[in-house]
Amino acid sequence: HSDAVFTDNYSRFRKQMAAKKYLNS
């Protein structure tokens, strides 16, 4: 199901953004 794939990719993307913010701070 495309929605499930999108949600999985989006959550992974959010984690990466959070990790970058954490490392840059």
UniProtKB/Swiss-Prot annotation:
Domain of life, per lineage: Eukaryota
Entry-linked SMART domains: GLUCA
Gene Ontology MF annotations: neuropeptide hormone activity; type 1 vasoactive intestinal polypeptide receptor binding
Organism: Gadus morhua
GO terms under cellular component: extracellular region
BP GO annotations: adenylate cyclase-activating G protein-coupled receptor signaling pathway; mRNA stabilization; prolactin secretion
Localization: Secreted
Pfam families: Hormone_2
Gene label: vip
Name the record gives this protein: Vasoactive intestinal peptide
The family this protein is said to belong to: Belongs to the glucagon family.
InterPro entries given in the database record: Glucagon_GIP_secretin_VIP (IPR000532)
Main location: secreted
UniProt keyword Secreted present: yes
Alphabetized UniProt keyword annotations: Hormone, Secreted
